[in-house]
Amino acid sequence: MMTKKAITVLSGGLDSCVATCVYAEDYEIHGITFNYGQKSFKQELKASEEICKKMGFTHEVIDLPWLNKISNSSLTSDNEIPTLTHEELDDLDICEDTASSVWVPGRNIVFTSIATSYAESIGAEIIIVGWDKEEAATFPDNSKEFLESFNNMLNVGSPQNIEIKAPAIDLNKDEIVKLGDEIKAPMELSYSCYTGHEKHCGVCESCMRRKRAFKLADVKDPSEYNE
C-alpha cells in the first residue's frame, strides 16, 4: 500500500506546528517554508527545520523575493512592528489596525497556490495549513470562508483530488495549545515573533497571543521572551 503524502505550509509558528502534527501518523509529510523577505525568516527557518527533523518530515525553502518588493508590510519593510497590551488583544478596532500594518498582499493565496502546485507534482492528497479562528477575526485569509472557497477552486481547477486541511480553523489559540499538548506536538521548537529576534520580543501581537494562549490553556509556556 502506498503511503499517503501531504504538503504542509510551515512557518515554524505555533499554529502550523500543531496543525501539521495532527496528520503526522497518517501521512508522509513534506514541509515547505516561504522566504518572502520577512524579518523573522531566519528564526522561522530554524524552527521549521527543527520541527521537521524531530518529526521526520522532509523540508525545503521556497524563495519569493518579488513578494517583498511589492509589500509595504511592517513584516518586510523598515516600518515599525506594532505592539499591543494584553487588554488590547480583544479590541477589534485596534487589532484591525495592527493587522493592516503586518498584512502582506495576497500572502496565503500565493502560499496555498504554490503548495497546490507542489502537491500535484508529488501526488499529495492534502495541504496542511495553520489557519485558525482567532486570527480569522482580522485576517480574512485565515477564515473558514476562505478555506471553503479555496477548496472549491481546487475542485474545479486541479485534475487531482487535493484538499486543504486546516484542523485549527474552529479553534482559538489556547485551544490550539491544548491540542498540541494532547498530541505531543513539539511546540517548544516553534517560533511566533514578528521581529525575528532570537528570543520572542514578548510585545508584538503574535507574541502576546502566544503568551495568552499558553496561560489560558494552563500549559507551561516553553518560550523565552525579552519582555
Curated annotation (Swiss-Prot):
The keyword Cell inner membrane does not apply. Binds 1 zinc ion per subunit. One of its GO terms (molecular function) is ligase activity, forming carbon-nitrogen bonds. This is 7-cyano-7-deazaguanine synthase. It comes from Methanobrevibacter smithii (strain ATCC 35061 / DSM 861 / OCM 144 / PS). Its cofactor is Zn(2+). Zn(2+) binds at residues 193, 201, 204, 207. Keywords: ATP-binding, Ligase, Metal-binding, Nucleotide-binding, Zinc. Belongs to the QueC family.
